[in-house]
Amino acid sequence: MNLHEFQAKHLFTEAGIAIPRGYVARSSAEARAAAERLGGSAWVVKAQVHAGGRGKAGGVRVIQEGDEIERYADSLLGERLVTHQTDGRGQPIHALLVEEGLEIARELYLGALVDRASQRVVFMVSAAGGMDIEEVAASEPERIHTVRVHPAAGLQPYQCRQLGFALGLDKAQVGDLTRMMQGLYRLFLERDLSLVEINPLIVTGEGRLLALDAKVTVDDNAVEIGRQSQIQDMRDLTQEDETEVRAAEHNLNYITLDGNIGCMVNGAGLAMATMDVIKLHGGAPANFLDVGGGTNAERVAEAFKIILSSPSVEGILVNIFGGIVRCDMIAEGIVAAVQDVGVEVPVVVRLEGTNVEQGKQILADSGLDLIPADDLADAAAKIVDIAGQVA
């Protein structure tokens, strides 16, 4: 679960991390009032969307006149911002963050994430702040410095100093960085975060360290079990894929992709393998969809509806392994779902597991135009061929 910048900075404030003064605005009048409240001669106005690259896309601007703030706010609010991290439709803008203008001496990068390989929280810094850190890692990896935090010992002051010295900070700034990193680490643990980024972390003209930007991702599992109820209230569904939100309401794990072959599979591992085999046969999956272990007719019907909501889908591959549930029950669910939904694209079905022969017989006796497959390779070859003919 992602947070808006202003929400992330609210958490930063609770953790004692210094941020610029600023206010959230949801109208042009509120934006101007925020600037007047801040005072000064320059302000930074930022579109609040769940995407990076806002500056290059016109979603961040330094403004020096109140009238211009209103005009700029009017041009953003209610519109959609398209960046290199969004799809072609972009993300809707419902709020702006208006902050004080600051003199910037240096732009740095500070981030923390869960490294699955080492099973540690890893802190990263770079003197290449304000840039896409992935690009820096690819082109100049020597500019990124990291420390791994032992879960029993926690983040140690010497590790913070190590990164501060790597950035060339002076003694006072190293102390600021140490306090900032320790606050971030506490926040990371207390709020069940999986990622936090400050890009850029700036050194002001006065030599202070400030979090000029903020990106926070919360572990979805912690939110779903209710451990982070306060953060759950911060969720902005308008920033999420509508189909994925709908799928989650029915306990379906769905991710939109760019292909034309819809996939319905039980089990995340089998779903990924199914997509791999489709690609191997020259096709392109339109989605990842895990219907889960307790598959029933209602869930299968909803899965079909969600898959078919994409106009790009020209065929569907159903790949089910009957372990927890029997294949005959799954087949009955597929037949009922296809009859209920009125599926008009070709459907290839591969069943394997308990009572598989009974399941295949149910499909054969249904009178529906369901195409059986003997194994996954056969299923992938058939759906790729059929979808290609439809296209």
UniProtKB/Swiss-Prot annotation:
Record's GO cellular component terms: cytosol; succinate-CoA ligase complex
Cofactor(s) the protein requires to work: Mg(2+)
EC number: 6.2.1.5
Positions of the ATP-grasp domain: 9-246
SUPFAM superfamilies reported in the protein's UniProt record: Glutathione synthetase ATP-binding domain-like (SSF56059), Succinyl-CoA synthetase domains (SSF52210)
InterPro entries: ATP-grasp, ATP-grasp_succ-CoA_synth-type, ATP_grasp_subdomain_1, Succ-CoA_synthase_bsu_CS, SUCC_ACL_C, Succ_CoA_ligase-like_bsu, Succinyl-CoA_synth-like
Reaction equation(s) it catalyzes: succinate + ATP + CoA = succinyl-CoA + ADP + phosphate; GTP + succinate + CoA = succinyl-CoA + GDP + phosphate
Domain of life: Bacteria
Membrane-spanning segments: none
One Gene Ontology term from the biological process aspect of the record: tricarboxylic acid cycle
Pathway, per record: Carbohydrate metabolism; tricarboxylic acid cycle; succinate from succinyl-CoA (ligase route): step 1/1
Functional description taken from the UniProt entry: Succinyl-CoA synthetase functions in the citric acid cycle (TCA), coupling the hydrolysis of succinyl-CoA to the synthesis of either ATP or GTP and thus represents the only step of substrate-level phosphorylation in the TCA. The beta subunit provides nucleotide specificity of the enzyme and binds the substrate succinate, while the binding sites for coenzyme A and phosphate are found in the alpha subunit.
Family, similarity comment: Belongs to the succinate/malate CoA ligase beta subunit family.
Record note on quaternary structure: Heterotetramer of two alpha and two beta subunits.
Protein's recorded name: Succinate--CoA ligase [ADP-forming] subunit beta
